[in-house]
Structures are given as C-alpha cells and as structure tokens.
Amino acid sequence: FESENPDYKNRQRLEVYLTNASSFLKGRRIFVDHFYRVNGNQGSNNLYINHQFNYENKFFEFAQGTVPSASNGNVVYRFGDSFKTSGINDQTHYNRMYNKLGLTYENTSLGKFQFFVDDFRSNYYYNQILIFDTRTVSNALAQKINSAGGQYEYRKNKWNGTFLYSRSITNQSLSNLDAKMQFDLDNENQFTFQYQNINKLPNNNYNLYQSSYVAYNWSNNFNNEKINSLSASATTPWVNASFQFSVLKDHLFFDDIATAAQKLAETQIVSPSQ
C-alpha cells in the first residue's frame, strides 16, 4: 500500500481480522544533558562535571468494539476467549526517570576519560490485579537500579573510538560492555568495528501483561538476557557491507502455543518463553 502498488491501492480491499480495533500511544519526554567545566579556560587539560536527566511518561490504549470478526465468511475469535463480549478498552501505563552524574577528564592528546554513577527508576502498571484459580497476575512492575561505570573516547588522526563499561551496584546483576572503533581512510572510505557484551533485564511485557483476552494475561520472573555481539562494516564508493555475529543466552521470544483446533479456527495464541 505504501509503495503505491496498484494491486493494493484500495486499502479497504485488504482483508484483515480486526476491522473495528484501534491502538493509541501517547508519550511525554523531558531530556537535559549539560556539563560544567571546572577549569576557567579551555586548555589541553580540562575537567568537567556532567549531568544527564531523562523523564518519560507513556500511555498505551487498545480499543476494540466487538470481539468476533469475519474472515472468508467465517466468524473468527482471533485472540481466543475474552472477558468481554464488546467494548474492549485495555490500558497500559509506564513512566521512567534516569539521572546520571559524571566526572570527565579531557586531554587533547590522550582523549576523554569519564567516570559516572547513575540512578534508574521505572514503574510499569495496570489498574487492577487479576486473580485466577491457580495464579495471580499482579498490576505493576517497579524497578530501581543504580550503576557505576566509565567511558573512554579517543580521536586521533584517522582513528576514533569509544569504550564503555558499566555495572549495577544494586541487587540486579546488570552489565554493559561496548567497544567501538572507526577508521576513516579518507572522506569516502570508512571502516567500523564493534564488540558488545550485555546483561540486561527482560522487557516489561515479557514479565507482566494484562488484557481483556483470557490467554493474554501473565506474570513471570524471567532471567536476564545475555548478548555477545561482534560486528563490522565498510563504507566505500563501490560497496557498503556489514557483518554481525551474535550469541544469545536466555533469549526471550513469543512462542506460538495455539492448538491445532485453534489454528484451524484462525485463532492466534502466543506466550512469552525463554
């Protein structure tokens, strides 16, 4: 449709499962990144105090007028059984606040050395707790994470690079190692190399999700995802090439758990898995 293919020019001719559903995402963001140079005049050696602040607030809504839909003349319950027969209105709320305070030493020959501590707080929540016969789906995930780390930036002649390492100092075991180098042979030829080793928390919607659809409600406690990644790229007048090799541990994904009967009825059921 977006490519203006004449076969799909009339969008209403495309058959979809949900003809009366809509989704809405609203967000607000405040971002401040500033620094103060301790030494009075810019010189070959400089000392800075850095501060970064980020606040985000998001609201997501999914609305659907009627639960059943039509496909090839058949009535389809696309996401299975629902607590409601009509008027679905599911809402998710999320807010986060991030503060980072750092001290940076800059030398025109050696590069920049930064040491920092940060504070991350988030709240992901719904307006109700769901109680089933054998399980309970909570209404909120709250996180408070403090980390410490360092970063080194180097720019000399045709080389520039950034090396970052941070690790949580609170109960969560989180870490991030990111090393990136770029070589500019000339204005038209650049080569980039990067290595990442990340230990991160699962996305919130894997650990907590609520919906008007019965099968789409869960509360989990998955392990952290671990990612090892090596990549390289080359940009030249003749070719743009890139390479990436990644090893994933405790990878999270949504698994199709629909039964044969549900698939025959065009019902789609997925569940988070690790």
Locations of regions flagged by a protein language model:
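Solvent-exposed, glycine/polar-rich loop segments of beta-barrel outer-membrane systems
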Residues: G65-R78
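Outer-membrane beta-barrel porins/channels
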Residues: R78-S86
